[in-house]
Amino acid sequence: ITSIMAQNGYAVGLVTDAGLDAAAAASFYAHSEKRQNYYDIAAQLKDSPLSLLIGQDFKRRKAFQKEDLDVVLKKSGRRMVSRVTAGEKMPSGKVIAALKNVPFALDAKAESPNLALFVEKAVEKLQGGDFLIVAVGEKIGLAAENRDTAALIAETAAFDLAVKKAFDFYAAHPQDTLIVVASTAEAGGLVLGTDGAVSPAVFKTQKVSIDTFKSAINRFRR
């Protein structure tokens, strides 16, 4: 869809709360036999129609004798930046914002980057003409795969805030805006309780994601 829209004169942006070369986001700009071919996937950005890409940094597993990824992308006219904030405008031209970390919503601080911010900045940059923004809430799936129900609930709420940013634009341009919300395959099984013993309130006591909890435990083991 990104290529089709670009061929029809639309500016195209892709924003994600996970890795720029992770499968969900990469499926909109790359073709590969294996999702683990991170360098070859990311290098395809040089020929992609994307005007803007925002998300967590590439894995940068450089293959032997292959050119540094930043060099490849800069040669294609992309400007590389490492942060996105509410108070700063996105640079002109084609931009790739590769952030060091985009935390789970449960782990986020007030200043942490998030999908809603990315949608807002994409709208600001692309709204001068016809545009398409693809927003990927991949951390919902990651939380499900981790069997982390509290994190999944928080990520779903965070995704709702991102949709709200799109809806704000729709409210100002109702005749020119289409918002489509879709899901990929279900990931992971979630359990709230057994035999009717369901207590959603228990999830309010969880303060961090399982990923952050595991990292803390591993630090104590060293």
Where are these regions (language model features)?
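A post-motif C-terminal structural segment
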Residues: 22-222
